[in-house]
Amino acid sequence: MCSFVRVGSPKPLQTSASPLEMSSLRRTRAPEISELGLTPEQKDDIRDRVLRGSKSPTELGFDLRLEQDRKWRERMGSSEAKSPPCHALGVGLERHTISGTPTEMGNLGLHKGSAFQGSKPLGVLPGRVGPENKGLPPRLRYGGTLHPPFSTVHASPLAAESRRRPLAWGSAWTDAVVEKQPVVGLELRKEPEKEPTCVVMNPYPEMPPKEVDIGLPQTQESDEAKNTEPLIGLVREPSECPFAQQPEEKKEPGSTEPGVEPPGNIRPIYSGKFFDRVPCWPSAGKVKPVGYRVATCLTEKLPRLMTPPEAKKYFNFRYPPAGAERVFYGRANDPQIAPYLTHGLRSKISIPMGSLINPQPITTFQQKIKDKKESIYFSHQRAPLGKSHDQTPGLPKGMDVINTTLGTPTIRELSVRDTVNPSKSFEDVLKEGQEGHDLYTVSHNDYFAGEAKNRKYNPASFHRFNLYGIPTPHFNDGRTMAKALHWLHELQMERGAKIVSKRVDDFKEKFQHKLGKVLDPIAETMNVPPGHTFGSCLHPEEYGAGDLIHYRSPDEYLRGKDHQRAVVAAARHHLKKFNHQNFDTLQVAFRHYDKKGDGVIDRAELHEACVQANLHLDKMLLDHLFDYCDVDQDGLINYLEFANFLNWKDRIPLKEHEKRVVVKGKKPDCENVTDTSMGEAEPSLLINPEDIVPKEPGSSEETLRTIQRPGDKVSHQYKTTSSEINAVVGAVPSMCHPIFGVPTIRSDISAPRIRRVSDMNNYGDEGNAYSLLHPSIFSQKGVFERDFFKTRSKEEISDILTNIGVKLSKEEFENVWNLASKKHQRGEVCVETIRNVLDELLHADLVKCKTAM
């Protein structure tokens, strides 16, 4: 018994599912090999080929049966009487192990999908069609072979039910089916016009097949094709493994535009163009998505997207519309106050310019009245606009104005054109010009251009075409022309001496500036030597401004001693460099100078040290150097003076053992022996402890203190002139002085409520450099000056104090609020006023506590 299924109208070729099954790990799983009468070696070969992904077991079994049939036909020896492809296919299908039940023989539903993916005549399968493929199952697009009973996909509910039942097929039923049906799912066409078509009927309600777009162009079906009876084919349900993973249904994208394929829809590169001869091999080239086209990109989508108002202000600030004002996005939503403000006096609106340039059209009656009013004017009568005036009032009555011509008619004999350019040939004009020329040469001396004058010489002795005289000199370089372009006196002036007027020369010498010299207009009137100085010479004082400021004595004046000071500074620098390069410590350097070892340096020792340092000084310069270093004026240079004036003490550190150096007193002079100085002097330290100071504040390194000369100290008794100005009790303070110019902080004008972007004035509400370098805690938290001085209500002030941790009772808060409201004339209170009141109350409590203690 067979059941039938209804197939939809013919459609273009669509895709089908792959015969290979996938495991749960998305790997290819080799299905069970049906019993096809194969040897164990052939079964192993089939299983290996399935695992390599070349062909499915069904395809391999089908091909093997075809090979066996081919060998059987060869053994039969009848090469001419070959079976048709459909018969060969049927023979190959006879021995398949077909799963099913006898009661459900006709329920030929298969996997998900349409019945035939578009109806075809029986015997013609989707795939490659050609004479070389007769009798062979067609191939799939993505590799593998398509078999009608095994790879065709069904979406019938009967198929789903059949998959849930345990199916068992028998060979007896298969033989019966094969006897009745030579080919499953195919049509035998020996005679197309005579053979009937074997179809399968569907006893269940018709369900429209789900169309799958493969990217090929769809042909428009006619009404006749739509109304025709759908074709029906005989199909068979394949054996299915109960553990095989079902193919997932593809979800159609929900947001695709009509007529536009989604970008993820990728077609095979050979679709509709070529036959894939080797489907198991990967295709060469790049598979491009066939989604959005150029036409889709160039098609404008309507309605256009609107920019939200929140982002529109930023766009209008950067790209304002034509003729619109560029408004900063920070004040784009501010209330428009400026357009409604009126500055000055409002002027009365006069006649607008538009009505004057383009007045409104008037009616015919108004035009008549206007012409009547203007007709009385003489200018309107004698010179009307756009036409000549009416001369009828000045002419006789009854005169035909149009046909009457006034004046004497002009007789036109020859036009100007004929006079200037007569209509004659060149020969006629030349002939007329030659007539009477001989007479004109005698009477008027009228010769043609270049014509020689006939002087009527004797032709026997003189011929007018002969040349007489010396040939004119000629040069091709143009020297003669250059000479002719200059006047004769100019050439003579160039050759002669340059004569300049005495008056002009005196004027230039007196008033013309000379390079590198000062202009002296009266230099010629001064009969004095060049180095003469006019006026009385001022002799400089012995002291200068520095001597007065430092309160120096007359013997210490520095005026006129520049050379002496420079020589002393050079000698000191030479000794400092010598000590720094040759000695490691100040003690070793001082010991080199102190030859006697008494802890001081005298003049002889300093002179000897200078000679050893290759510094030769005369007696005067040596005395100046010694006097400069001897600050206490005792005639000796001690260790502290030596370190300050003859060494770089900051470069040579002070060692620890140098602090404990002891110097023995020198022996007394035998000639001046007194009773009080009989014994030797007591030993003393080389460096006094009070002369040792830290090198830097807080540093562990120590050095000798810096001593100053008496002349370097500044007197505390002098006063500058600037300190004496306005140093009068009761004088006018400087704040009352008149101020000129524009102040930096514009406190003279009130700050605008809404400031423009171009307003760069400082109204006192901006921070200074100190606030930028040292921001307060309020600035770091984002609280600014306007937040402190903003007027707030009592509840808001109470919430602010509570949030910052200031706990006040109701009576205390009322007291603080009353004190703060009294500080403003309107009773307004801000955070700054509350802070000041709290500080005043806290200060008053501290004063009370100190008084009580």
Swiss-Prot record:
Gene3D superfamilies: EF-hand (1.10.238.10)
Keywords annotated in UniProt: Calcium, Cell projection, Cilium, Cytoplasm, Cytoskeleton, Flagellum, Metal-binding, Repeat
Subcellular compartments: Cytoplasm, Cytoskeleton, Cilium axoneme; Cytoplasm, Cytoskeleton, Flagellum axoneme; Cytoplasm
Domain EF-hand: 581-616, 617-652
GO cellular component: a single term: axonemal microtubule
Keyword hit for Transferase: no
GO molecular function, one term: calcium ion sensor activity
Chain sites annotated for binding Ca(2+) 1: D594, D598, E605
Region (Disordered): 1-31, 244-266
InterPro entries according to UniProt: EF-hand-dom_pair, EF_Hand_1_Ca_BS, EF_hand_dom, EFHC1/EFHC2/EFHB
Gene Ontology terms: biological process: flagellated sperm motility; negative regulation of protein binding; regulation of calcineurin-NFAT signaling cascade; regulation of store-operated calcium entry
Protein residues bound to Ca(2+) 2: D630, D632, D634, E641
Its biological purpose: Microtubule inner protein (MIP) part of the dynein-decorated doublet microtubules (DMTs) in cilia axoneme, which is required for motile cilia beating. Cytosolic sensor for calcium, modulates the interaction of STIM1 and ORAI1 upon store depletion and the activation of store-operated Ca(2+) entry (SOCE) and NFAT translocation from cytosol to nucleus.
SUBUNIT field: Microtubule inner protein component of sperm flagellar doublet microtubules. Interacts with STIM1 and ORAI1; the interactions take place upon Ca(2+)-store depletion and dissociate through a Ca(2+)-dependent mechanism. Interaction with STIM1 inhibits STIM1 interaction with SARAF.
Protein name: EF-hand domain-containing family member B
Organism: Mus musculus (Mouse)
Gene giving rise to this polypeptide: Efhb
